[in-house]
C-alpha cells in the first residue's frame, strides 16, 4: 500500500515557502541596529546601460523601472565593458538616525558614480574609481567606501553606476562605522606583518647570496 506523500495541506505549505523565498529576494535591506556587517548583494537589483548614457535622474525617478533585474548571491559579470546600474533600498525601522558605510570591496573598478536618494531626490553623490584621483574617494581607503545616513523610520535608496575595463565584480557590504574601522585596522596589521615577513626573507636571502655567492639564494 502506497502512502500519500503530499496532500493539499502539504502542497499549500510548499507554495507558501516558495513565495516567501521569492519575496525575500530583491526586497528592501532592513537595517539591523546591532549588526556590525550586513551583506547587500541579495537585496540588489541591476540594469545594463546599453547604447546611450542613461540620465541619472531618469533612472532614479523611475523612468526605466521595468528594466531592473535581481542580482542574486553575488555581483560578478566577468570581463565586460558594459555599464551597469545597481539599486538597493535600505530600510531603517528604528526611530533614530543611523550612520553606516557602504563598501565596494574591489579596488580595480575604473569608474563608480554613487547616489544617495530619499523621496526621489538626490541627497548625496560622488564620482570615484581606479581611474580617478585618490582624493575623489569619500573616505581615504584602498577600497571604495561611501558614508550613508539612514533617516528614522524611512527608506534610503542607493544607486551605483559602474563602468570598468577589467573584471566587473561589485562586492557590497553595509557596515557600522566603528566596526568598519576596527576591521580595517586588523586588515592593516595583517598586511603589514605579511609584507614585513616578505621583506625579511628578501633581506636574508640577499645576505646569504653576498656571503656564499650561491645563485640558489
Regions found by a protein language model. Give the residues of each.
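Detector for methionine-enriched segments
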Residues: 1, 18-19, 32, 193, ...
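Bacterial N-terminal signal peptides that target proteins for export
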Residues: 2-12
